[in-house]
Regions:
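PLP-dependent enzyme catalytic core of the Aspartate aminotransferase-like
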Residues: 48, 89-90, 98-99, 113, ...
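Conserved C-terminal alpha-helix-loop-beta "cap" of PLP-dependent enzymes
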Residues: 284-360, 366
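Conserved N-terminal alpha-helix of the aminotransferase class I/II PLP-enzyme fold
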Residues: 7-61, 83-91
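N-terminal glycine-rich anion-binding loops that anchor highly charged ligand groups
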Residues: 2-14, 371-380
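Active-site-adjacent structural elements in enzyme catalytic cores
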Residues: 361-396
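Conserved PLP-enzyme active-site core in the AAT-like
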Residues: 51-281
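Glycine-rich beta-alpha junction loops
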Residues: 3-8, 196-197, 258-260, 275, ...
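Glycine-centered tight turns that cap/initiate beta-strands
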Residues: 46, 118, 281-287
């Protein structure tokens, strides 16, 4: 827990600032505690290099902005977290980066049609938040690589416990570590991991990595750092200029959560499936979406990419639409209303009026069923007894 580091000589310090030696020169860029925790996540994902950020939003922003600039274009799945959609569709457009959104179940031709000469990456979520659409990773990776660009995937909902996305062709993975990894709603955080498999020098699309960086006396990241080029640039350039580094104490709390990740994820999945089976047969429930259910449209993809479990999130609709959904929330006794997933408590929310509130009526109509039909999300972690039954049976 320190911002500053001592050096034996000015020469040692100079070599650090010139990136000629490894070490630490300010905690806005790197910290030993943070690096240790990032290393654990990198090992979990099977990557070559990783870094922590102060939030999942920061991780997704850095992952894209590290290789894209004004005048560039990104292809993204349309089934992504509302905050990420707003980041891409509003904030990053202000920076001059354009986005085209395609359905997560788009075929290769549809994905290809979204590409432009200035496309720099493809983005998606392993399991979308909150609609639970599963990205056909191999299909998106195939089209991305055919066009000489990387596939970036947010693996927050699946975690590396349930899906090792690099095995399916993903090049860069991001996480909101706030969720399952930290697991106790005690600290915000994010992470980025590089698979080391993408060749940044195969074309001229990534000059930030393959041409000299004058802010470091002309160093070229791909020449100096090889497979570590992408994470090194994000650390020493973006962190230097933009910040977004979590405190060492936040990294410590994340580390505590990581030690029980494999146990908690298994319990999340076990409970979620039990609740999903209960809800699908309840007379007051209009529909249930949970890919582990055999009759779910996403089940085949779940079997392929997530054979050990999906996640602890369920989406469902209460008959009667939004008004009925609000009554259900008001009647909850065990679960709490919260805009968070995957901590030690069971939570429910109405996405259209909370996490996806920024979407307009037209966007909501075009969105997933959970945003149109009074959808709710539950995140069971404790015993499943009484989670929703009392709330559904209340007369209120």
């Amino acid at each position: 827990q320190s911002t500053t580091y001592k050096y034996d000589s000015s020469v040692e310090m100079g070599n650090l600032f010139d990136l000629k030696a490894s070490g630490y020169f300010y905690s806005r860029l790197q910290n030993p505690t943070n690096d240790t925790v990032a290393g654990k996540i990198t090992m979990l994902e099977g990557g070559v290099a990783g870094m922590l950020t102060s939030s999942g939003q920061a991780a997704n922003f850095y992952a894209v902005f590290n290789i894209a600039q004004a005048g560039d274009h990104i292809v993204s799945s349309s089934a992504i977290y509302g905050g990420t959609y707003n980041l891409f569709n509003v904030t990053m457009r202000k920076l001059g980066i354009d986005f085209t959104f395609v359905s997560p179940d788009a075929d290769e031709e549809e994905i290809q049609a979204a590409f432009k000469p200035n496309t720099k990456a493809v983005f998606g979520e392993t399991i979308s938040n909150p609609s639970l659409d599963i990205l056909d990773i191999e299909r998106f990776a195939k089209v991305a690589h055919k066009n000489g660009v990387p596939l970036i995937v947010d693996n927050t909902f699946a975690t590396p416990i349930n899906c090792r996305v690099f095995d399916w062709g993903v090049d860069i993975v991001t996480h909101s570590t706030t969720k399952y990894m930290e697991g106790h709603a005690s600290t915000i955080g994010g992470a980025i991991v590089d698979s080391g498999n993408f060749d940044w020098t195969q074309n001229d699309k990534f000059p930030g990595l393959t041409t000299p960086d004058e802010s470091y006396h002309g160093i070229t990241y791909t020449e100096a750092f090889g497979k570590g080029a992408y994470i090194t640039k994000a650390t020493v350039q973006l962190m230097r200029d933009l910040g977004s580094m979590p405190s060492p104490h936040d990294a410590f709390l994340l580390n505590v959560g990581l030690e029980s990740l494999h146990l908690r994820v298994a319990r999340h999945c076990e409970n979620a499936k039990k609740v999903a089976n209960y809800l699908k047969s309840h007379e007051k429930i209009a529909w249930v979406s949970y890919p582990a259910l055999e009759n779910d449209p996403q089940h085949a993809l779940a079997e392929k990419y997530l054979p050990n479990g999906v996640c602890g999130v369920i989406s469902f609709g209460v008959k009667g639409g939004r008004e009925a959904a609000e009554k259900f929330l008001g009647n909850l006794k065990v679960a709490m209303i919260a805009t968070h997933v995957a901590d030690a408590r069971t939570c429910c929310l109405h996405p259209a009026s909370s996490t996806h509130r920024q979407l307009n009526d037209e966007e909501l109509k075009a969105a997933a069923q959970i945003l149109r039909d009074g959808g709710l999300v539950a995140f069971p972690t404790e015993t499943v007894y009484g989670l929703g039954g009392n709330a559904l049976d209340e007369k209120a």
